[in-house]
């Protein structure tokens, strides 16, 4: 085929068509009740009436993966970074009590590699399956003047729904509520500019370095996908009146736990009430970070926190265990005096 004007400008239209064909099977496995239309429509459609909600409230979220992408690019491993993208979006709207309904992705790249693009979308579809959300649309933009040939950026967008009377908003959490933490898989998708600095700039580790404290090569540890908490937490919401939910992302415990509180409340976190994953000890050691800095930046092994009444703790733990989740009582809500997050025993600064 003769090279057209667009190709001469650096945009491979044929490669774009190949991507669409390659991803169809991945999109198909995410279909759920309510989806209307087919891949390739101008707009993705979803029938809200299929949910049988009396007063539906739509909850939306958007996020990316940050500089974790640079590790995926350097390692040439692209099949799980899409899970991270989905997780960052759906876990956020779950904090409002919403069930994710559908997801859209956006990939911008310097050169469209159909195999690589398929791997990225495969990860997105895997994440959508875990979340029960349909992948109903997306965009792959080839922009050779903006990105290097091997570079790409990834962002996602999700919409969920919740019955209005079950919407979780600030104000429901009360002094005396108990905090239940659900484990993370590792670093998840925040703090990677610092992570990369610690390992590859300040200490000159190789991607596949074997570190004694870790049970997998370094890059495998750093690329572990962010956990998606949707299905187990939705089961809890069916059986327990959850007062608050926090997705522990950028800003760690210090920034995120107060987001579910009113200004007159604080949380007391019981240090030692859950196992700290080895990767955090390794980063603290090689990054020469103090304890407070770690809790200000990272999830420290807890990816989501629920606030429930004391009398609902046993039921909450029971439902989580029944759904394959380890869970820990990690603290309580108190009346605020000074700081909004208090660590029992204090932290080294």
UniProtKB/Swiss-Prot annotation:
Disulphide linkage map: none
CDD domains in the record: PurM
UniProt keyword list: ATP-binding, Cytoplasm, Ligase, Nucleotide-binding, Purine biosynthesis
Catalytic activity: 2-formamido-N(1)-(5-O-phospho-beta-D-ribosyl)acetamidine + ATP = 5-amino-1-(5-phospho-beta-D-ribosyl)imidazole + ADP + phosphate + H(+)
EC number: 6.3.3.1
Molecular function in Gene Ontology: ATP binding; phosphoribosylamine-glycine ligase activity; phosphoribosylformylglycinamidine cyclo-ligase activity
Top-tier EC class: ligase
GO cellular component, one term: cytosol
InterPro entries: PurM-like_C_dom, PurM-like_C_sf, PurM-like_N, PurM-like_N_sf, PurM_cligase
Family listed: Belongs to the AIR synthase family.
Protein name: Phosphoribosylformylglycinamidine cyclo-ligase
Native species: Listeria welshimeri serovar 6b (strain ATCC 35897 / DSM 20650 / CCUG 15529 / CIP 8149 / NCTC 11857 / SLCC 5334 / V8)
Classification of source organism: Bacteria, Bacillati, Bacillota, Bacilli, Bacillales
């Amino acid at each position: 085929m003769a090279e057209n004007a667009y190709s001469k400008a650096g945009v491979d239209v044929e490669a774009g068509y190949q991507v669409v064909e390659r991803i169809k099977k991945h999109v198909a496995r995410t279909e759920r009740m309510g989806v209307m239309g087919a891949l390739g429509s101008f707009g993705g459609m979803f029938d809200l009436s299929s949910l049988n909600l009396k007063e539906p409230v739509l909850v939306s979220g958007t996020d990316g993966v940050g500089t974790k992408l640079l590790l995926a690019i350097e390692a040439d491993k692209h099949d799980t970074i899409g899970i991270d993208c989905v997780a960052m979006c759906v876990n956020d709207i779950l904090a409002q009590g919403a069930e994710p309904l559908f997801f859209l992705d956006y990939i911008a790249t310097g050169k469209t590699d159909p195999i690589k693009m398929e791997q990225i979308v495969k990860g997105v579809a895997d994440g959508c399956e875990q979340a029960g959300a349909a992948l109903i649309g997306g965009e792959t933009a080839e922009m050779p003047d903006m990105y290097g040939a091997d570079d790409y950026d990834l962002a996602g967008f999700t919409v969920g729904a919740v019955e209005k009377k079950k919407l979780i908003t600030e104000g429901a959490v009360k002094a005396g509520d108990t905090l239940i933490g659900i484990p993370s898989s590792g670093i998840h998708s925040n703090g990677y500019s610092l992570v990369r600095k610690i390992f590859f700039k300040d200490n000159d580790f190789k991607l596949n370095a074997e570190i004694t404290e870790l049970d997998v090569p370094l890059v495998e540890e750093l690329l572990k996908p962010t956990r998606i908490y949707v299905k187990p937490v939705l089961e809890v919401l069916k059986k327990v009146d959850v007062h608050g939910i926090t997705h522990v992302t950028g800003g760690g415990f210090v920034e995120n736990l107060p987001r579910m509180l009113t200004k007159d409340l604080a949380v007391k976190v019981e240090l030692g009430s859950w196992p700290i994953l080895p990767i955090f000890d390794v980063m603290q050691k090689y990054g020469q970070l103090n304890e407070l800095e770690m809790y200000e930046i990272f999830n420290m092994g807890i990816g989501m926190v629920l606030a429930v009444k004391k009398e609902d703790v046993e039921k909450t733990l029971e439902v989580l265990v029944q759904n394959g989740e380890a869970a820990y009582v990690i603290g309580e809500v108190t009346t605020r005096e000074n700081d909004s997050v208090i660590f029992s025993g204090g932290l080294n600064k």
